[in-house]
From Swiss-Prot:
Gene3D superfamilies, per database record: Phosphoenolpyruvate-binding domains (3.20.20.60)
Binding-site list for 3-methyl-2-oxobutanoate: D45, S46, D84, K112
Annotated protein name in UniProt: 3-methyl-2-oxobutanoate hydroxymethyltransferase
Entry note: cofactor: Binds 1 Mg(2+) ion per subunit.
Gene name per UniProt: panB
Record pathway: Cofactor biosynthesis; (R)-pantothenate biosynthesis; (R)-pantoate from 3-methyl-2-oxobutanoate: step 1/2
Length: 266
């Protein structure tokens, strides 16, 4: 696969071609994902749940994410790598710079932070120093205790209006990508149209510029057996993991996934 860059992803948005993203934590799955045509690999703090067995992402550390980012880099064959800054890993500007530097040195092409308009200063300072940033909005798992659980965000008009304004403000601050998790499909479509940067969705309908799922979820692997509404098991009916990954790419590119049943209404 030719090297995917931020310019490539921006071009896909302009052309109206959907972007494919999956979480990835090791070299073997990085290689397999690239072979199937996955364009973006997200080294997510979700590893705390699907690899470590924790009940949230909060225990994950920057050093653990750097370790897995380096592993993904070694198996990567052209995909764009995004790495999460973990819970409290960007509480101060000094922490933000130090931890973002670790992840970029480990092999990330972009770092992802969770939050809203309060992230603007950190995003601006990182962007000015050559670190591309993805702003993760909507349901932000690192804030699960504040949010009162894993709930759809932006369902009332005040929340929706604020989220639209925050997305525009974060783009203006320098965010090069936005990820929307568990927001009403109509709101996600509005935000996607309102900003020029690529918008990736998970539980955000089909109108975003691309889709992401947790690798283990889309392969039907779960410790708890609880499957989010927005997940589809792509192993069903497939002979191999490669076929499942390829089916995901085909359905995202063909805009057959996600279906209406995978999204949320206001």
């Amino acid at each position: 696969m030719p090297d995917i860059t931020l310019t490539t992803l921006q071009s896909l948005k302009l052309k109206g071609e959907k972007i494919t993203m999956l979480t990835c934590y090791d070299a073997t799955f990085a290689h397999a994902s690239c072979q199937a045509g996955i364009e973006v690999l997200l080294v997510g703090d979700s590893l705390g749940m699907v690899l470590q067995g924790n009940d949230s992402t909060l225990p994950v550390t920057t050093d653990e994410l750097a370790y897995h980012t380096a592993s993904v880099k070694r198996g990567n064959d052209g995909a764009f790598i995004i790495a999460d800054l973990p819970f409290m890993g960007y509480a101060t500007l000094e922490q933000t710079f130090q931890n973002a530097g670790k992840l970029m040195q480990a092999g990330a092409h972009m770092i992802k932070v969770e939050g809203a308009v309060w992230l603007a200063e950190s995003i601006r300072l990182l962007a000015e120093r050559g670190v591309p940033v993805c702003a993760h909005m909507g349901l932000t798992p690192q804030s699960v205790n504040l949010l009162g659980g894993y709930k759809v965000q932006g369902r009332n008009e005040a929340q929706a209006r604020q989220m639209r304004a925050d997305a525009i403000a974060l783009e203006q601050a320098g965010a090069a990508m936005i990820l929307l998790e568990c927001v009403p499909s109509e709101l996600a479509a509005e935000i996607t149209q309102a900003v020029k940067v690529p918008v990736i969705g998970i539980g955000a309908g089909s109108a975003t510029d691309g889709q992401v799922l947790v690798l283990h979820d889309m392969l039907g692997l779960s410790i708890t057996g609880r499957v989010p509404k927005f997940v589809k098991n792509f192993m069903t009916g497939q002979a191999s993991i490669h076929d499942a990954l390829s089916a995901y790419v085909a359905e995202v590119k063909g805009v057959t996934f996600p279906g209406a049943e995978h999204g949320f209404s206001a």
